[in-house]
Amino acid sequence: MTYQLPELGYAYDALEPYFDKETMEIHHSKHHQAYVNNSNALLEKHPELLEKCPGALLKDLTQVPAEKRTAVRNNLGGHVNHTLFWKGLKTGTTLQGALKDAIIRDFGSVEAFQAEFEQAAATRFGSGWAWLVLEEGKLAVVSTANQDSPIMGKDVAGVSGYPIFTLDVWEHAYYLHYQNRRPDYIKAFWNVVNWDEASRRFEEKQAGCGCTK
């Protein structure tokens, strides 16, 4: 088995004017593809690791030979993070139901949640990700550096939790369209959050059947 670049499930221009076609195409077909290629090359002599769920491998990187561990953390992390990111994007969905209720419960209001998420994304120094996670039954906003993920746990990533959705704040995710205006890119994100997918992940995890991918 080898890792494969996932289909987006929508056209590169489907998220315009918020996320532009050129950025989406380069981001998916070049940047994400590179993470896939590098992960396959790193693990080609370890078929037993390629057979594992990528998320499960990232949760316990001690399974990876020490000399390859950092490279797998970065590249397989990039593959898994981007796969979740693409699934979490769609126009025309609405925050509602159990996820909305939980956001209000844990943050006080939807507006307070959005402000906290925007702050986490804007203040992540350099490259990284902002996340909405479920941790011990409670929603939280966290951020990670580089291609780290909350699924790696606190010892590796500094944070933990089950990802509900994420935002890529690497410059390659927005620079062609937004240049150095990261806050504008972050605010545009709310127009393309796939709340249906976020709700599905939240409800499945609440029911005890969510899979870390």
Curated annotation (Swiss-Prot):
Binding site for Mn(2+): H27, H82, D168, H172
MF GO annotations: metal ion binding; superoxide dismutase activity
Catalysed transformations (reactions): 2 superoxide + 2 H(+) = H2O2 + O2
Signal sequence interval, chain numbering: none
Gene3D superfamilies: Fe,Mn superoxide dismutase (SOD) domain, Iron/manganese superoxide dismutase, C-terminal domain
CC annotations in GO: cytoplasm
Keyword annotations from UniProtKB, A to Z: Manganese, Metal-binding, Oxidoreductase
Top-level taxonomic group: Bacteria
Summary of activators and inhibitors of this protein: Inhibited by hydrogen peroxide.
UniProt-listed InterPro entries: Mn/Fe_SOD (IPR001189), Mn/Fe_SOD_BS (IPR019833), Mn/Fe_SOD_C (IPR019832), Mn/Fe_SOD_N (IPR019831), Mn/Fe_SOD_N_sf (IPR036324), SOD_C_sf (IPR036314)
Entry EC no(s): 1.15.1.1
Subunit structure: Homodimer.
Entry function: Destroys superoxide anion radicals which are normally produced within the cells and which are toxic to biological systems.
PANTHER family: 37S RIBOSOMAL PROTEIN S26, MITOCHONDRIAL, SMALL RIBOSOMAL SUBUNIT PROTEIN MS42
Family that this chain belongs to: Belongs to the iron/manganese superoxide dismutase family.
Name under which the protein is recorded: Superoxide dismutase [Mn]
Species in which this protein is naturally found: Haemophilus ducreyi (strain 35000HP / ATCC 700724)
Lineage: Bacteria, Pseudomonadati, Pseudomonadota, Gammaproteobacteria, Pasteurellales
